[in-house]
Amino acid sequence: METPHIPVLLEEVLESFSRVPEGYFVDCTLGYAGHSSEILKRYDHLKHIGIDRDDEALAFSKKRLEPFRDRSTLYKGTFATVLPTLKEAPVTALLADFGVSSLQLDKKERGFAFDSETLDMRMDANAPLSAYEVVNTYPKEKLEYIFDTYGEVRSYKKLASAVVDARAKAPIESAKALSEIAKGVIPPGGKIHPATLMFQAIRIEVNNELGEIEGLLDAIEAKHYEGEVVSLITFHSLEDRLVKNRFRKWSQECICDPHAIRCTCGKKHALGKALSRKPVTASKEELRVNPRSRSAKLRSFRFKSDS
């Protein structure tokens, strides 16, 4: 079976789970099962749960994981909603890769690519909100907010005005047309396409990506297991900040008010510890083979174990 997506930081992810005990491995962003298939091959003491909201990805992964059908179960939905409902236990390894898959980026009908003839960007094709609605119906002030907050676009006001001016003449029907608007506002240059940050912002809005990550972290915090390792791959600073701050919170022994004169909590409140101080990034070899890995950052956290 031809693999449409190269999993990022694969060896580093595998290594992060090298000491997990017997139990369930949950892939919260199953995609095309690149990480899952390799983890199932290497760690035969783990059973597998895959979660995704993309029907196409689930159908592909079901076939790809057929050799492991006795150890694998797939669920459709967002990870923030599915994870709290899982009955399978104990979960000893959990992975989430928050990037958009290469297949989604490359398939023009999905509307993620800069030259797509559609304007969609939905991870779940049945979801009510698409990029078309965001671009063509959101008021200028709301576009400014998402371009600034989710895309960290410097010229967010100019960009929002350009979008509103363009759609006043005719609806913006394609990602390609939207890219041209960005090119007219943001000068070319540097390593990324002028529309990159705008597309990121719209995609985050359409799929509630930051809200989903917060929901996942809340679900993990509410229900985790002894010795469980959580490995999360982020692709931009907004995602990484959420993960870094939550891992820092989970690592804190003291939960007293920062302004307290002395500690009264006993300093025994850490849930576990991060496996590395800084995020793990792609090697030079991986960057050569898969340039899309350049923005990937892996952070891993191990919950405490009595043993």
From Swiss-Prot:
A Pfam family reported for this protein in Swiss-Prot or TrEMBL: Methyltransf_5
What's any GO biological process attached to this entry? rRNA base methylation
Q: Which reaction does it catalyse?
A: cytidine(1402) in 16S rRNA + S-adenosyl-L-methionine = N(4)-methylcytidine(1402) in 16S rRNA + S-adenosyl-L-homocysteine + H(+)
Report the EC code(s) recorded for this entry. Answer: 2.1.1.199
Its keywords, alphabetically, are: Cytoplasm, Methyltransferase, rRNA processing, S-adenosyl-L-methionine, Transferase
Q: Record-annotated residues binding S-adenosyl-L-methionine?
A: A33, G34, H35, D52, L83, D97, Q104
Q: What InterPro entries would the database entry show? A: RsmH, SAM-dep_MeTrfase_MraW_recog, SAM-dependent_MTases_sf
Q: Which domain of life is it from?
A: Bacteria
Q: Per the record, GO CC terms?
A: cytoplasm
GO MF, one term, reads: rRNA (cytosine-N4-)-methyltransferase activity
Q: Which family does it belong to?
A: Belongs to the methyltransferase superfamily. RsmH family.
Please give the name of this protein: Ribosomal RNA small subunit methyltransferase H
Q: Which organism is it from?
A: Sulfurovum sp. (strain NBC37-1)
